[in-house]
Structure formats: C-alpha cells, structure tokens
Amino acid sequence: MSDLENFVPTANIKVIGVGGGGNNSVETMIQAGIQGVEFIVANTDIQALQRSSAPNFIHLGENKRGLGAGANPEVGKKAAEESIVEIKEKLKGADMVIITSGMGGGTGTGASPIIAKIARELGALTISIVTTPFEFEGNLRNKNAQEGIKNLRAVSDSIIIISNNKLLEQYGDAPMKDSFLFADTILKHTVKTITDIIAIPAHINLDFADVKTVMKDKGDALIGIGRASGKDRAVKAAIHAISSPIIETSIQGASHTIINITGSANLTLTEVHSAVNVIKNAVGPEMNTIFGATINESIGDEIYVSVIATGLSSSKKFNSEQEIKDEVSSMLKTMEIDLQASETKTILINDPLPKDEKMVLTSLLDRDSKILEKDDSQDDTLPFFLKRNV
C-alpha cells in the first residue's frame, strides 16, 4: 500500500512560501507531491504569483501594481502589514504554519516576520525554515538576512536556518544554478520530514502533539538526514544524520529531538533502538526524545534517519563540516554501541560521513531541475548576475 493510500490527515498544516525563494521552494514541494498540507504563496510580485502552482496566494501590499520589493526589506514589511486581513484569512484554522523564505532580499526578509507573528497569534505552531545568502552576494544582503532572522526568531516557535554557504562547501563543483535547487531540495526534505511524521501512519507512530512538544517555544533548531545500507546500517545512518552536510552547528546540547527512522519491511526494533541510542548519546543525557518508525518498501536495503533537534542556543557558533565530523569522531571513541561488524566503529571514527554516503541530493536534483524550469528574472533571492534576461 502506498503512502498516499495510507495518508490520513490529522492536523491542519499550512505551508506558506514568502518572496521569490519561498515561492520556488513551495513549487518544488507541490511538484514532489508532498501530501497533507495546504500550500500558499505570498509575494509583492504579481508575476511570481501567476507562475506558481499553489492553490492559494496572497498578493502583498495595497499597491497592486505588483512590481516586487526591490530587495528592500522595509518594502516587504510594509506590504505585509497592509495585507494583515488577507493573511489572517488564509492562515485561519491552521494547527501548524510552516513559513519558508530566502533571507536577504526584500519580500521574504521583510514580510516573513509579520506573517509568523500573525500565525502565532492565531494559535498555530509556527515553524520558520529559511535560507541565508552566499557570502559572495555582498555585505548588505547578508546584513539584511541576519536582521531578518533576528526578527523571525522572535516570533517563531522554532526556526531552522539552511546556509547556502554550507551547501557551497559541499556541492561547490555543481553548476551555479543548481546550487539554488540544492537549497530547495533540502527545504522540501525538511518540510516532508515534519509533515510525514504527523500525517503518514507508522509502525511506531508520532502525531501533531509530539511535534508540538518538541517545537513549541524552542527557538533555534536544526535538521540532519542520513542514510546507509548493509551491516550496521542503522548506526551508520544515525551517525551520518548528526554529521549531515546541512547541519550548521553541533547537535550537542539540544533540549528536544524528533527522530524518524524509515526502512523496508526488514527494519528491526533493534535497529530502531540502535539509531535512537546513537543520537541520544550524541546530544546528551538531558535530551527529551520522541521517535517514530515508518516502513517504505521503495528504499530497498537502505535505512533513512531524520533528526530534528530543537532548543539550541541562538548564540551557538556555526561549525564547519570538518569541525562537526571531528566532534562526532571524538564522541564515537567512548560510545558503547552494539555492532555486527567489528570494523564499523573504526570506519566511522575515521570518517563519520564518507562522501558516497552523503544525503542523496544529486539524484533528486535531476528531478527537481526538470520541475523548476522557471523564469528567474523576478526572483529576489538570486544574485543579479544569475538572473536571466538581464
């Protein structure tokens, strides 16, 4: 039986993409067939809204000429303030609102905090998932992004920040245009991890109340996704998840985690326990954990482990991939793990995330590249020199 046949809506979840980057991310999610959510796009740019497949849209601002925010966050903020009645109407009835946007431009940076504040006032669990600019995009754009994140953090229950610079470290050899699709793919996976936990029936089930416990009033959060196959696959996938290329900082010290383990019918309870135990050891003894396990026959011998960690300090410094790997290696040296193969621990200590085990982005990118054949000339998240028709 497919996930779609199994799908049972249990909470009213709305995903709203704000600005050019947010609109693009929502389009990726729609085309990927994410189930159990209502999609909304919001923009000051009417052309961007007309290109979207989302069933619901909000044209921000009283000025309906629809010319965009000109990369000015104040314009985006004012436009959202002028559209409060419509925003409230579109978000009404939601149990959870997920806001996705690119920080640094005008609409996403300025309007997202206004929308998050409204969602929270309406009683919805409010989660913001945002991207930050590449360093080469300049000081002003990066400064705007940091100010936007500060404003968004103050009005969100949880915020997950995905750094384009971090993606550049990992996938810098990819064509430049594809770098933005990597970010969209990760945003899609982040939203899907959250919504699947709530909406897809599982053998070890989680629901909206579980997600609310972990994410309400928790501030900074992160997501890690790992995969592995063969002997000790659960342990390896868990280690890969906490060493994930998209993790901005160490998972150590998080107050709460959601762990979701996906495997085929041969997934065992011992493997589930092993994966959860690895992450509990990495985070620390004070962590509160909830976990679920889902069967998906399409992934064959692989196991996927997704972890969302919340309650991280906003002052915690960002770490490079090597710094995170070094920390995981050090932790592994003293961790007691039941393993099928004696060499597994040594292999993981030497390299917690081998290149061939990194999250499967490249294969997904081929599909998403076909999905997002769009006109980027109005996308306020793209650097000027990457836009078409200029």
Swiss-Prot record:
Keyword rRNA-binding: no
Compartmental location: Cytoplasm
Keywords: Cell cycle, Cell division, Cytoplasm, GTP-binding, Nucleotide-binding, Septation
Major localization listed first in the record, in broad terms: cytoplasm
Protein's GO biological process: division septum assembly; FtsZ-dependent cytokinesis; protein polymerization
A molecular-function term among this protein's GO annotations: GTPase activity
PANTHER family in UniProt: CELL DIVISION PROTEIN FTSZ-RELATED, MITOCHONDRIAL DIVISION PROTEIN FSZA
Function per UniProt: Essential cell division protein that forms a contractile ring structure (Z ring) at the future cell division site. The regulation of the ring assembly controls the timing and the location of cell division. One of the functions of the FtsZ ring is to recruit other cell division proteins to the septum to produce a new cell wall between the dividing cells. Binds GTP and shows GTPase activity.
Subunit-level organization: Homodimer. Polymerizes to form a dynamic ring structure in a strictly GTP-dependent manner. Interacts directly with several other division proteins.
Name of the protein: Cell division protein FtsZ
Source organism of this protein record: Mycoplasmopsis pulmonis (strain UAB CTIP)
